[in-house]
Design a protein with these regions (language model features):
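Generic short alpha-helical hydrophobic face used as a protein-protein interaction/packing hotspot
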Residues: 26, 67, 156, 222, ...
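Generic N-terminal leader/targeting and pre-domain segments
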Residues: 1-58
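Cys/His-clustered metal-coordination modules, chiefly Zn-binding fingers
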Residues: 174-251
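Hydrophobic, aromatic-lined core segments that form the binding pocket/scaffold
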Residues: 39, 47-209
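Generic structural motif recognizing short loop/turn segments at the entrances and edges of beta-strands
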Residues: 5, 9-13, 23, 80-87, ...
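Acidic-enriched, low-complexity/disordered segments with a strong bias for Aspartate over Glutamate
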Residues: 14, 24, 29-32, 108, ...
Length: 251
């Protein structure tokens, strides 16, 4: 992995090596229920969340951005990825991703067919990293799995939308569409689950423009109000329903 790639990941996804930004908590520690509870209680105060469920949802969005978005971006743009195992990952005090020394490696497609390489990379990502993290967040906070997995899907939609808006090279657009279709149509085996937990939430292109709203609410609006009042996400289903109700009243 050259320095240009690492600088891109640092700039776009807040990914740092351990010597650049020390860790606050290793993700392996977060998988311990007692330590996870302690961390969520601290994080809840940091972001001014009213309860553990809101804190867990916000943390899942952040972690998906750091790990999932960066991986999918790398697959499209660089045709390679950082091998982000649970053991390699930690969060800094600033809630950026700290990659621990000696526990990561860059993986190119190399001699493998890209489809075979992609399946191995994404199975490792979702089944051994994302799924365990979401499971412990659910267990500790009782936030529904559907919210957590849609948080992941929203990050996927977002990173692909941004690449399509900026990246015009046909080979990369082809990779993106292929990767999206693979994720959309993957079986539950990719996630070590009975069913694909994100397929109903994935959207790109015209479908995303026509129907941008989420199916579940990430609970962001429950964070402490700022000077502008309650803050809803742009794709918030609650905000959308309120708008529809007002429009019906005006008719």
């Amino acid at each position: 992995m050259n320095s240009n790639v690492m600088n891109k990941l640092k700039t776009n996804f807040d990914i740092y090596l351990e010597h650049e930004m020390p860790k606050d908590i290793a993700i392996t520690d977060l998988l311990d229920e007692e330590k996870c509870l302690s961390f969520l209680q601290k994080y809840m105060q940091e972001i001014k969340a009213p309860n553990l469920s809101v804190a867990a949802s916000m943390l899942s969005k952040r972690y998906a951005y750091l790990v999932v978005s960066s991986t999918l971006y790398s697959m499209v743009v660089f045709n390679g990825v950082l091998n982000l195992s649970v053991k390699a990952c930690a969060l800094t005090k600033e809630r950026k991703l700290c990659i621990q020394a000696g526990m990561y490696k860059w993986q190119d497609v190399k001699s493998l067919e890209r489809e075979e390489w992609r399946e191995k990379v994404l199975h490792h990502l979702f089944s051994t990293n994302i799924k365990p993290v979401l499971n412990i967040l659910k267990k500790t906070s009782h936030v529904p799995s559907s919210i957590l997995w849609e948080n992941v899907a929203i990050r996927i939609n977002s990173v692909y939308r941004k690449i399509l808006a900026e990246e015009l090279e046909p080979v990369k657009i082809k990779r993106l569409n292929s990767d999206f279709n693979f994720l959309k149509n993957a079986s539950g085996d990719l996630f070590n689950l009975k069913e694909n937990p994100i397929k109903h939430y994935l959207k790109i292109g015209e479908e995303l423009k026509l129907n941008p709203c989420r199916q579940t609410c990430c609970l962001n609006y429950k964070l402490e109000e700022n000077a502008k009042g309650i803050v809803y996400c742009n794709n918030c289903p609650i905000k959308s329903n309120q708008t529809k109700a007002r429009n019906q009243c005006d008719e």
